[in-house]
């Protein structure tokens, strides 16, 4: 059975304090011990229910408390979701994440959510959902449907958390992660850089994640996307090197986890993204939109992959699907790039 290092905030801060090139070298060494450094997991994120969220997360345009111009939408039909998943798979994604702007899912929606999971799984894709807090029963129902991952971010350190969110406690988030893990679903949990937090808060977030009973299999690191109408719309820009440091420290502290470049990539140039991959990032969201905020379009991602010699990671599927994935990989990396589908529209 794998053993995990118990981290302290002081140890995490010591990593943040390292000279950048030394930190990158250490992170790359750790990355190569656990992953193929040329493989990048490609995921698609679809908003299956948008806006009108009762929570007060200060960074989020989906909160009903802020005037951001976002139009709310009801839960998508199962058939619509599966059609989006099919198109995402055809465009090269191997993992399909479905997000709903809820504090927690209603019982009346659970049968539809289960059908979405079952349908996407039938396509040979990994499944992920982010729906807010889950009860024990809800976690087990999603597990029975075949859900692979559940995303529930901690966002920041326990100390800074109350400055950003008051409608859900930090402990509630930890409780949901425990319910997900106990149900046999893999955990996806990370945070946001640029909320106004200190380096110590970033260290505290990573310590919380790394010291879970088992570290998350997937750790999304977001750069704040400032949205007009939210309380954080005038926050200072995130320094690219500080973001890269956070990726590198996450890689060192959670060596077996996928570290995902999530929201904020639209604000990063190619050089910053390349350094993030060098620092140990090995997963991206692929498509023009992450729920309600911009993301680089697919063509740009594939061009960057070609420049860096990176390959989209393939999932374990049937023989026929493996051949299809290989053909897609060749097409994406070496052929003319077609216009790909934006599943999040």
From Swiss-Prot:
MF terms in GO: 2 iron, 2 sulfur cluster binding; 4 iron, 4 sulfur cluster binding; biotin synthase activity; iron ion binding
Example of a GO biological process term: biotin biosynthetic process
Its EC number(s) = 2.8.1.6
In the record's cofactor note, how is the cofactor described as bound? Binds 1 [4Fe-4S] cluster. The cluster is coordinated with 3 cysteines and an exchangeable S-adenosyl-L-methionine.
Enzyme class, broadest EC rank: transferase
Keyword tags:
2Fe-2S, 4Fe-4S, Biotin biosynthesis, Iron, Iron-sulfur, Metal-binding, S-adenosyl-L-methionine, Transferase
Q: Where is the Radical SAM core domain?
A: 38-256
UniProt cofactor(s): [4Fe-4S] cluster; [2Fe-2S] cluster
Asked if the record carries the keyword Metal-binding, the reply is: yes
| Listed PANTHER family | BIOTIN SYNTHASE, BIOTIN SYNTHASE, MITOCHONDRIAL
Report the function annotation for this chain.
Catalyzes the conversion of dethiobiotin (DTB) to biotin by the insertion of a sulfur atom into dethiobiotin via a radical-based mechanism.
What is the protein's quaternary organization? Homodimer.
Name of the protein in its database record: Biotin synthase
The organism of origin for this protein? Yersinia pestis
**What is the gene name?**
bioB
């Amino acid at each position: 059975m794998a053993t995990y290092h118990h981290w302290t905030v002081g140890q995490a801060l010591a990593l943040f304090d390292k000279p950048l090139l030394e930190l990158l070298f250490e992170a790359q060494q750790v990355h190569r011990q656990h992953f193929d450094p040329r493989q990048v997991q490609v995921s698609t994120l679809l908003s299956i229910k948008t806006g009108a969220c009762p929570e007060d997360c200060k960074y989020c345009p989906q909160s009903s408390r802020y005037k951001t111009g976002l139009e709310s939408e009801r839960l998508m039909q199962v058939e619509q979701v599966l059609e989006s998943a099919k198109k995402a798979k055809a465009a090269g994604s191997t993992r399909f994440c479905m997000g709903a702007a809820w504090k927690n899912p209603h019982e009346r929606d659970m049968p539809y959510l289960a059908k979405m999971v079952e349908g996407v799984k039938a396509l040979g894709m990994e499944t992920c959902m982010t729906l807010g807090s889950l009860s024990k029963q809800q976690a087990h129902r999603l597990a029975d449907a075949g859900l692979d991952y559940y995303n529930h971010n901690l966002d920041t350190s326990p100390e800074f958390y109350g400055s950003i969110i008051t409608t859900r406690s930090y402990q509630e988030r930890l409780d949901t992660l425990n319910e997900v893990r106990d149900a046999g679903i893999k955990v996806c949990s990370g945070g946001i850089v640029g909320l106004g937090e200190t380096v110590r808060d970033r260290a505290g977030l990573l310590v919380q994640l790394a010291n879970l009973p088992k570290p998350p299999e997937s750790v999304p690191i977001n750069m704040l996307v400032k949205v007009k109408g939210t309380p954080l719309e005038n926050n200072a820009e995130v320094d690219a090197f500080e973001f890269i440091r956070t990726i590198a420290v996450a890689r060192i502290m959670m060596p077996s986890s996928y570290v995902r470049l999530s929201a904020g990539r639209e604000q990063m140039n190619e050089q910053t993204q390349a350094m993030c991959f060098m620092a140990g990032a090995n997963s991206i969201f692929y498509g023009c939109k992450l729920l309600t905020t911009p993301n680089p379009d697919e063509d740009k991602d594939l061009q960057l992959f070609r420049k860096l010699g990176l390959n989209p990671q393939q999932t374990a599927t049937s023989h026929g699907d493996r051949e299809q994935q290989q053909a897609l990989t060749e097409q994406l990396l070496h052929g003319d790039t077609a216009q790909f589908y934006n599943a999040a529209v």
